[in-house]
Amino acid sequence: PQETGLTYNSWFGKFHLEMIWWHQSHFPLWGHPELLNRTLGWYHRAEPVARQIAERQGFDGIRWMKMTDPDAMEAPSKVGSFLIWQQPHLIHLAELVYRATKDEAVLKNYYDLVMKTAEFMYSFATYDEANDRYILKGIIAAQETLRASENLNPPMELSSWHYGLSTAQLWRERMGEPRVAEWDTLLAKLSPLAKDAEGKLYLASEDATDSYTNKRFISDHPAVTGALGMYPESRLLDKEIMNNTIDKIFEVWNWDETWGWDYPMIAMCAARVGEPDK
């Protein structure tokens, strides 16, 4: 899918895999899982290339890249190669199709892809021995103003990692397979969302302590809201702090530097904290 939909030719029509969630995750929710299911066949065709990418980079499983050609070969990008928020989408989308259909054939069709996607996610996370936790680093966040060389534990990615691995474990249970102990360890020790010094706001990432005063961090996607807007509540976050964070975003954000999907993301986050009229 394109990043800006069907009416504007962004990036010369290049393929942006993270946009499939925005373009098609809604279909199963209003009675048309078959439309999403039809598209998900691409992941089967792309799996050999995605597996080679993960292997070349020293990871397990399969890595879904942000920007590729239609056959999943990487397209050159100084940003796209560092993004990871598209990685759990296959798990999320397959789960939505299964929930809508309750068809065991869906589990069988996507089970191997779900497992290999989760294997990459586990191997990509880094164990921080000094603090006995798992972290996400060396990435550009969905809020692309955060630099890969500095970025540590961006909030939306943390939530997506927790959701993706939790759901992969649920698929194992549905298929009569035991849970993977190492995945459960990661889920228990995955870093929570980073907070400001007063503990009242969530940061753009753990290193971005000036998240609401530095123009770089109040521009682009307010991706911190995606941690709850796109993914369900988890032990990683607190709704009251997220509500405070939404209020702060409304107060200080550089709205001229936002994108179309930022607004539904904030709206869904507001609904989940009990403030749908925001």
Model-derived features: where do they sit?
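Glycine- and aromatic-rich loop/turn segments at beta-sheet edges
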Residues: P1-N9, R51-K66, S123-I140, A197-D207, ...
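Active-site core of glycosidic bond-cleaving carbohydrate-active enzymes
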Residues: H16-Q52, L83-A100, E104, K108, ...
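Active-site-adjacent "gating/activation" loops or surface patches in catalytic cores
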Residues: G5, A46-P88
